[in-house]
């Protein structure tokens, strides 16, 4: 015999459902450099952990994830979902996503509700077809006071996501000019109906750092060290100044390059990108883009460091080998270490600079330019130690 929920789920398969996961928020209330959607659960970022759990239920015909364009470029390395650029508000992100929805129903949730499990999804979906929106909620157990008056807490609900909506009803509701904080409120304001069902505490939303302690479904990030190697060369130019390792070098030459030609910083950028799995310097700072003409390589490195933190990486150490017949850099090593460490946000002892020659071999040996090999090690930010 099938029970009611099983029969309801079997009936739900007669309907098509798209899952929208909203991940375009700035995490401004999270108070860390890392965006919460990039916290790691094992080796996976939080958004992928949530999407994968939902996908494995088999309930959804399509999965859409909203985020910023920068995030989307990196997200594509993890999974083949439909990614949509988010808007300035949650509602605008939802509108953008709905342009890609052609299923009868849509389930909308926030990636920050990371402990949504199959049982909870099954419960929500089992109510498909009963109203324009299915809304999970939690009861209030504390006394509620508004404007110095005590409110009957039996009349107050803590509304959660995910919420299941009839797609046509939600699209119509969002044509209104008002801003709504959840889907069902928009649908009801537009004359639609909603059904409340009891939610679950484990669907708590990560908003503040302390919320992480409430989520038992999340395992710690992997402790693996991620390593990358970068290599770059630049020929000398008899015009301009020489910048190497983030500092100005006393030399009769500069470097022939699109930017300021700091070959050591360029190799380091590639090493960091390699460790993070984020491509290469040509992808992030293309040399055919006029905005990088004459660019200060220190600023490019600083931009990358911000991105690495944003995506949940911590720089462990870097090691840079400079191969050159000239200039002699022995007296510049400490200044390079201090400058690079200040940009990376790590202690100077974690930045190593080595110099070598090529024993007069090749273009470096002929004094035509400089080559650099850089190594970088990263780890995932460990949010369990906050």
UniProtKB/Swiss-Prot annotation:
Pathway: Isoprenoid biosynthesis; isopentenyl diphosphate biosynthesis via DXP pathway; isopentenyl diphosphate from 1-deoxy-D-xylulose 5-phosphate: step 2/6; Isoprenoid biosynthesis; isopentenyl diphosphate biosynthesis via DXP pathway; isopentenyl diphosphate from 1-deoxy-D-xylulose 5-phosphate: step 4/6
Name of this chain's protein: Bifunctional enzyme IspD/IspF
Site location (Transition state stabilizer): 29, 36, 258, 357
Listed cofactors: a divalent metal cation
Chain residues that bind a divalent metal cation: 232, 234, 266
The keyword Nucleotidyltransferase belongs to this UniProt entry's keyword annotation: yes
Superkingdom, taxonomy of origin: Bacteria
EC number assigned by the record: 2.7.7.60, 4.6.1.12
Pfam families for the chain: IspD (PF01128), YgbB (PF02542)
Family the entry assigns: In the N-terminal section; belongs to the IspD/TarI cytidylyltransferase family. IspD subfamily. In the C-terminal section; belongs to the IspF family.
Chain's role: Bifunctional enzyme that catalyzes the formation of 4-diphosphocytidyl-2-C-methyl-D-erythritol from CTP and 2-C-methyl-D-erythritol 4-phosphate (MEP) (IspD), and catalyzes the conversion of 4-diphosphocytidyl-2-C-methyl-D-erythritol 2-phosphate (CDP-ME2P) to 2-C-methyl-D-erythritol 2,4-cyclodiphosphate (ME-CPP) with a corresponding release of cytidine 5-monophosphate (CMP) (IspF).
2-C-methyl-D-erythritol 2,4-cyclodiphosphate synthase: annotated segments: 226-386
Stored SUPFAM superfamilies: IpsF-like, Nucleotide-diphospho-sugar transferases
Swiss-Prot/TrEMBL site (Positions MEP for the nucleophilic attack) positions: 153, 205
Keywords: Isoprene biosynthesis, Lyase, Metal-binding, Multifunctional enzyme, Nucleotidyltransferase, Transferase
Region (2-C-methyl-D-erythritol 4-phosphate cytidylyltransferase): 1-225
Gene Ontology molecular function: 2-C-methyl-D-erythritol 2,4-cyclodiphosphate synthase activity; 2-C-methyl-D-erythritol 4-phosphate cytidylyltransferase activity; metal ion binding
Reactions catalysed according to its record: 2-C-methyl-D-erythritol 4-phosphate + CTP + H(+) = 4-CDP-2-C-methyl-D-erythritol + diphosphate; 4-CDP-2-C-methyl-D-erythritol 2-phosphate = 2-C-methyl-D-erythritol 2,4-cyclic diphosphate + CMP
């Amino acid at each position: 015999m099938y029970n009611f929920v099983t029969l309801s789920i079997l009936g739900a398969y007669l309907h098509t459902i798209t899952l929208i996961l909203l991940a375009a928020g700035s995490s401004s209330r999270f108070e860390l450099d890392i965006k919460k959607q990039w916290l790691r659960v094992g080796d996976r970022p939080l958004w992928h952990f949530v999407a994968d759990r939902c996908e494995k239920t088999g309930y959804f015909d399509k999965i859409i994830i909203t985020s910023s364009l920068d995030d989307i470029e990196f997200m594509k390395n993890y999974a083949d979902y439909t990614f949509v650029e988010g808007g300035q508000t949650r509602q605008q992100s939802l509108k953008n996503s709905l342009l890609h929805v052609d299923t009868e129903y849509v389930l909308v949730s926030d990636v920050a509700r990371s402990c949504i499990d199959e049982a909870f999804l099954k419960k929500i979906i089992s109510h498909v077809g009963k109203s324009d929106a299915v809304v999970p909620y939690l009861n209030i157990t504390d006394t509620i006071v508004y404007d110095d008056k005590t409110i009957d807490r039996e009349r107050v609900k803590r509304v959660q996501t995910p919420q299941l909506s009839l797609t046509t009803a939600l699209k119509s509701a969002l044509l209104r000019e008002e801003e709504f904080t959840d889907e069902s409120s928009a649908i009801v304001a537009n004359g639609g109906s909603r059904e409340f069902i009891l939610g679950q505490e484990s669907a708590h939303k990560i908003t503040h750092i302390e919320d992480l302690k409430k989520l038992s479904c999340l395992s710690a990030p992997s402790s693996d060290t991620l390593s990358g190697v970068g290599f770059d060369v630049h020929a000398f130019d008899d015009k301009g100044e020489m910048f190497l390792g983030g500092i100005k070098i006393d030399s009769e030459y500069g470097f022939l390059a699109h930017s300021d030609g700091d070959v050591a910083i360029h190799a380091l950028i590639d090493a960091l990108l390699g460790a993070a799995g984020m491509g290469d310097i040509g992808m992030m700072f293309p040399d055919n883009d006029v905005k990088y003409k004459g660019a200060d390589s220190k600023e490019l490195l600083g931009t990358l460091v911000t991105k690495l933190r944003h995506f949940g990486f911590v720089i462990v150490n870097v090691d840079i080998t400079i191969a050159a017949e000239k200039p002699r850099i022995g007296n510049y090593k400490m200044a390079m270490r201090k400058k690079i460490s200040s940009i990376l946000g790590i202690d100077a002892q974690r930045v190593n600079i080595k110099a070598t020659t090529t024993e007069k071999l090749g273009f470096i040996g002929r004094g035509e330019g400089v080559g650099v090999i850089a190594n970088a090690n990263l780890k995932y930010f460990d949010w369990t130690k906050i």
